[in-house]
């Protein structure tokens, strides 16, 4: 059974474009959104809709980190997950007033749905739930700064891997080749339905997204000024790299609550006392810039975002 057609804004969260902060903002403003005829629908117990992304990954695909983290590798597990998410969304939609639009957001829409077939599965699932028309919003960040910020996040999470030396690495291309990303999504949802936005928007990502939504009028609720994921100075990153290498068990993902707590305390202290930014070595930065920066500026021009 489907619900009456209702508009949906699908936020395809690209890497290091404030998705976590945006999701927290939308979740905090549910009452305000309801008064505007909209609702933010995260997964139960989450801030985002990664469960919906996991539903749409090809059944034979076991490569995806999201599937491994959620324990969804066997075909019967995947099919059961799809049914569970469908029922959860149906219940959430049934609780909304008729005609209210919904906002769905996840970084995994971008990271995990890497083929037109997977994006098509998402489109079909939304249609089966009575969601439409669909407006897709994708924020795009300058690729070199994106990768430098990503490396800082990787180190803070306990990761020991360096940034790929080759900017043509498939993972780097996935998150830095913005033209290819837009082409995948527009090939499924249509060019007019997919809107690119430059990150960071001058008024804040929350206000920028709200301004794109039909029927939503300002003034908008204020956004938090504090950054939830600030960068670190080079010496602070070097300290964390040393800890990751010498004490690989001392990570934010440790099964021990005491270890996780101590790492959070250290991270908080560094965020307040050593906030800054990481820069790649000059030669590596030049290779990344030569491959992606010019194409990014051209894309901004084509999209009218320069």
Language-model-derived ranges and their functions:
Residues 2-306:
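Anion-recognition interface
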């Amino acid at each position: 059974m489907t619900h009456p057609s209702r508009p949906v804004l699908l936020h395809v969260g690209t890497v290091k474009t404030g998705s976590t902060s945006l999701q927290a903002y939308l979740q905090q403003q549910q009452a305000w959104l309801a008064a505007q005829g909209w609702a933010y629908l995260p997964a139960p117990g989450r801030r985002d809709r990664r469960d919906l992304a996991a539903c749409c990954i090809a059944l034979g695909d076991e490569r995806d980190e999201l599937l491994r983290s959620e324990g969804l590798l066997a075909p019967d597990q995947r099919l059961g997950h799809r049914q569970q998410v469908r029922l959860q969304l149906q219940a959430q939609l049934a609780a909304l007033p008729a005609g209210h639009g919904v906002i769905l957001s996840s970084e995994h829409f971008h990271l995990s749905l890497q083929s037109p077939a997977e994006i098509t599965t998402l489109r079909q699932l939304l249609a089966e739930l009575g969601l439409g028309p669909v407006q897709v919003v994708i924020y795009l960040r300058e690729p070199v700064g994106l990768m430098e910020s990503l490396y800082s996040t990787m180190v803070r999470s306990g990761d020991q891997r360096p940034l790929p030396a080759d900017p043509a690495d498939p993972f780097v291309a996935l998150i830095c080749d913005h033209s290819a990303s837009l082409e995948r999504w527009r090939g499924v949802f249509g060019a007019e339905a997919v809107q690119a936005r430059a990150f960071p928007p001058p008024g804040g990502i929350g206000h920028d997204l709200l301004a794109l939504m039909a029927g939503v009028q300002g003034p908008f609720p204020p956004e938090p000024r504090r950054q939830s994921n600030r960068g670190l100075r080079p010496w602070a990153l070097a300290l964390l790299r040393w800890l990751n290498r010498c004490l690989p068990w001392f990570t934010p993902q440790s099964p021990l609550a005491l270890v996780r707590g101590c790492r959070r305390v250290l991270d908080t202290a560094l965020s307040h006392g050593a906030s800054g930014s990481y820069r790649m070595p000059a030669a590596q930065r030049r290779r990344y810039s030569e491959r992606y920066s010019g194409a990014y500026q051209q894309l901004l021009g084509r999209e009218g975002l320069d």
